[in-house]
Every structure is written in structure tokens, then in C-alpha cells.
């Protein structure tokens, strides 16, 4: 069926092949108990685990652990140029081997494919949405979402000539390089931002033109802390896909902002029920359930919004602090250390208003200094945001290129 569908839109001079007919596919194996086979010897065999690869990795170049040679017969040996697939975690994600080693039963290996496939082209073909859709279709009706040799063997792939495969893989590799380099730059900018924030919100570095001792304040005494109270709790049926007002929950927090596209909605009556939790631009939000202590500063609200029960609205009621400055304090180690002291080494699943009564901190003595600090950090956030937008654009371009190049809608030769 998939073969017939593919034939309707790929070029006439391409083939459509079933992977298992042109490659050898095997499942890994695990010597047990594994601890008895691990070794630190240089003579050990690389023991490949999902933890040995990062999010952007295409190649497996090293491993944290090795097994003794006697374990090879109870496992599966893989070699340079082989492709391995995770059959459960990172479902179906391919990697190219740059080393030799052994794989456990959480991996599948694809070998002896080079009669018809270029290595890098096969990597991208297996990474494509076309392949992922086939995996999903094969798993339909099953509660266990994992791969096996039989499923991967049935995967159908478009197959141009080797020279065209190499050209396609080269173009996709170039866009991958751009994406990886941009991710590295974003991580670097975030690290710099984190370090700058830490020294500015603690007063370890003062900005030019400001002096005077910082002032000790208590967050609760200088704030209005509000959340949805128990009797106002929402039922699942009240979580709407469209409605009058955004409903902000703890899962909507992302990188100091609210992911509006992921929010549910509530009707007008639920929004109007409690003005204390109606959200406006300039508000500071703090999660108090689940992953506690996540914080968001609201600056891009485009319609009414209200809170679910797991979120505090924190609003200044004195001139002791600005909400934007406090946002950065709550993002810093100052607040993280406070939460650690609250937990006393154990996990806390709820942040109470009475807990925040205990939170004392030092702030600049003037609003002007707080705003100057905020301005520097906001500019850094804006730069990171623009880079992340650029990254998202590159990722969308890559997906479009994969769709067009791997099906022959766009030809390179």
C-alpha cells in the first residue's frame, strides 16, 4: 500500500524499495547481569547506550562504558558505517556509527545496505516524516510503542541513484550544520545571560552611576499573592479549545514566558468569577504545584487571561520592587536556594503562600537601578528570543527540504 502511494509522486527514474530486501537488520543483545561484564580496561569493547548521544548528534563517536570481550557473544557487534535505531526511547531515531562496539536490546542495527544506499542519505530517509508515519501506522492499535526487526524491515523508502543520494545528503547536512551551530550559539548566549543575571540581581556587580546600600525586603509583605481558590476549581469539561479567556496552567510556562499556543481557554463567566486572578501585561506568575518555582513575566498578552489553581499571581503593592526586576530574582539562584532551604533535602510538591512569607531578599534602593538592571537582562533575552526564532525558521526549512528532496519534488541533478 505504501509502495503504491509512493509511486504516485516520486520521479519515474527513482526506485521504491522495502528496506529489509536490501539491508540486514538485527536487534541488539545484553549480556546479563550487565554489571558482571562491564570493565574499565582499554581492551574492553564499547558498550553503546542512548546516554552516549546528544540531542543534535548524528554520529556515535564514543561511549561511557565498555564490556569485556567475553560479553560480545551475548550481544550484537556493530561497526563503522552501520546505522543503529533506538527501538523505544527516542523512538526510531537513527545514528551513524563512527566506532565499533556492542549494542543492547534497546537498539536495532542496519548493516550491508550500501548496494543501494548512501550512508548519509539513508540516515536522512530514516529520519524523515515519511518513515515516522510508517512506524506509527505499524504500531496502530498497540499499547506498546516500540520498534522491532520486522517493522523496520517493512519500511518503504524512495531510492534515487547513489550520486543523487549524495547530493541530497550534502544539502541536508549543510542545513544541519547551520542548526547545530545556532543551537550552540543560543546555549552560549544563555550561559552568559545566566551569569550576568546572577551578578546583577545579587549586587555583586553594580552598574555605573548607582550607589547606596541595597535594601532588605520581604516578598510577601510587599506583594499581593493570589491564586484560584479551591471552590473555584475547574472541571476537565471546562478546559476549552477556544473561549473567552486563556487559562494559564503550570505546564504553559516556557523559558520565562507563557506558551499561549498551548493554553486552554475558559468562558467569560469563569474569567469574571475572580478579578484577583485576571492576568495583565506586567504581571509576574509563579508555579506552586508540580514543578514548583517556575516563573513567567507577562509582556505579550493579547486577550483576557486567568489562572488555574497551580499558579500564583505576584503583584507589587509597594514601591519596594518592580515586577520585572523580581522576575529575574526569582529566576536566579537567590530563589532556587530559598526553595532548597524550604525542602530541607526532600521533594516539595506544593508552594504555599505562607512559604513565601519567609522569603527575604535584597533589592537596589531605587526603582531606577532596578530598571537599569532589568533593561540589560531584557536586551539579552530579546537577543536570545530572536536567535530562537531564527532556529525555528531553519528547522522548518529543513523539514520542508527533506519533504521535497527525499521524494524528488525538487531535483538536484
Residue ranges and their predicted role:
Residues 1-30, 154, 162, 208-230, ...:
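Non-catalytic DNA-recognition/assembly elements of restriction-modification systems
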Residues 404-413:
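Acidic, low-complexity, intrinsically disordered peripheral segments
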Residues 10-15, 122, 151-190, 194-195, ...:
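Amphipathic alpha-helical segments
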Residues 85-86, 286-287, 379:
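A generic structural signal for residues embedded in beta-strands
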Residues 4-5, 20-37, 51-80, 220-237, ...:
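Sequence-specific dsDNA recognition surfaces
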Residues 2-3, 12, 87, 102-108, ...:
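A short glycine-rich beta-alpha junction/loop motif
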Residues 90-93, 290-294:
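Short, charged beta-turn/beta-strand-edge "cap" motif at the junction between a beta-strand
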